[in-house]
């Protein structure tokens, strides 16, 4: 069996809002085709137009070969060898950033394809299951543009998440800084108030995470507010500092009473080596597409295990990425949770409609799946409906 082509789809919701802090509004779907008719599906959370260009761009020299050109003719079972070929062949144009994101979507699709060829679920190809269920936490984005609207929205959503069976949730408390929701610039007091209100809404027997979305410029400023969150039994505080502030994260590791989590934007195991050893992060959050796919995510899990750290995969996309996160977690005992954007609580039509058959979700957990590959199916109607060229054309009429 050989790879024959890479099919890509850039998708966009018609009601996208460029002021919103939600990358669930767009997507790139990658489908790897073979000469025997089997296909594999992947996605990645990045700018979909640029990722598509990276995949289909022609190579002009041996430091910058085209990804699709390198793939055609390869045996899809050789997933790890293909990853190395793509990484080395695109070293000048790839290596980090969008190049790795494009490789990540391809690699995810190759794991799905290999599972379909062998008749095995991805977790089984990763060495077997370390647990019978994966616990998903509901990732909750507030609606509104004022502190009052944020509080009402998050409290309503977290109560509904608990009603739907979730045993854990993360509130998106980005109320200041460069990536705040809808441009809000509130005080640190609101982060504390949101956390207190959500804890009161769900009660004590419920894991609560808080994402402040890179709100602070220095660790001591961040620590003052983190200390104030301690009474609310917060499982972790996510991304308090900018991505590359390794010294600041190390300071928080040494002084914070709450676990610190980050890693959603990092690429490859090499950047996670810095997070683990220099930044001393307690919980690393590889986004499977962005790190380079399941092949690279497995290596990151091994690195974290060697250092006694936790892995909680980031995912703010569709049922495709959620499935990849779940399979990774099944194969690794030190993955206590995966991020889960609940379709019923999401404003994104892509999240609600793109995957017609997702992994089963029961009482806040995903039971061990047994279908080959990722175990999901695309909704072809939604794939057509959310085509970015059609959406943009309709908006510009």
Where are the regions that the model predicts?
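Structured beta-strand/loop patches that form or line metal/cofactor-binding pockets in enzymes
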Residues: 1-41, 45-52, 345-352
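Conserved, mostly hydrophobic/aromatic
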Residues: 3, 37, 67, 106, ...
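Metal- or metallocofactor-binding catalytic centers and their adjacent structured scaffolds
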Residues: 33-117
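Hydrophobic faces of well-ordered beta-strands that scaffold small-molecule active sites
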Residues: 42, 136-138, 167-171, 208-212, ...
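Glycine-rich, aromatic-flanked loop segments that form ligand/cofactor-binding clefts
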Residues: 107-147
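Metal-dependent enolase-superfamily TIM-barrel catalytic cores that perform enediolate-based chemistry
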Residues: 133-250, 255
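Shared catalytic-loop signature of beta/alpha-barrel
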Residues: 227, 233, 244-365, 369-372
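Extended hydrophobic packing segments that form well-structured cores
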Residues: 372-397
